[in-house]
């Protein structure tokens, strides 16, 4: 489970340059403003190297949160020496054929992913994806369980249950829904042109029905013109009003990567971080 008190953690989550912690990075991780570090494929060579890297991180800051995107399918940062996890949509396809077997597979996948990461000292995988499947989405696509609210909620709860049994809390993403835009927010800023009713009755419903099972939520780098002109992670309407107030979510809200192409033009790194904090 989440071992750290979110109120005492620093607000920044940093990434690392390579597979070995540099002296500069060691010093950065000791700053009180830093509460977490996210690992990518460039930080991973082998299980033994990962153990050494995590030991070095913990030596610099024993209380820091260590996270990774280990969803399965095409988004799995640690591969060699780790289980090959299924894409969530393959679980969704099984669910269509046999709902019971789909739920079992979801729970087993969540447990296996979490148990393996925690064995190496990783606290969080940013999972599961709660976006609805839409074939036009390049960036989400088969990362999503299903195109239906009911199927996504059912499988997500089973997956989260598996994570929890292994001792890891869940982070739902990408609030309030990234699956209905074609553009990839790693490269450009997507706009979701759906009406507010369509958003609320779609992806948002998944978050609403799963919120009590989540310790954290990651926001989307997507603009929803039906609500405002801000990306969701900078939007008080989406974070403070709907997530914090309407859904009564008291957990951690992670912004998606603030160095991504979709937000890189929105001021300096410091300004982008401030805007995310101000949103709630």
Predicted regions and their residues:
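Alpha-helical scaffold segments that flank or form the walls of functional sites
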Residues: 97-122, 203, 272-278
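N-terminal basic, low-complexity leaders that serve as flexible interaction/assembly modules and, when applicable
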Residues: 2-34
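Short, conserved phosphate-binding/catalytic loop or strand-edge motifs used
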Residues: 130-138
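Catalytic domains of carbohydrate-active enzymes, especially glycoside hydrolases
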Residues: 27-40, 112, 119-124
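Second-shell residues forming the walls of enzyme active-site clefts
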Residues: 14-15, 21, 42-62, 66, ...
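A charged helix-plus-loop insertion that forms the helical arch/lid used to bind
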Residues: 82-100, 146
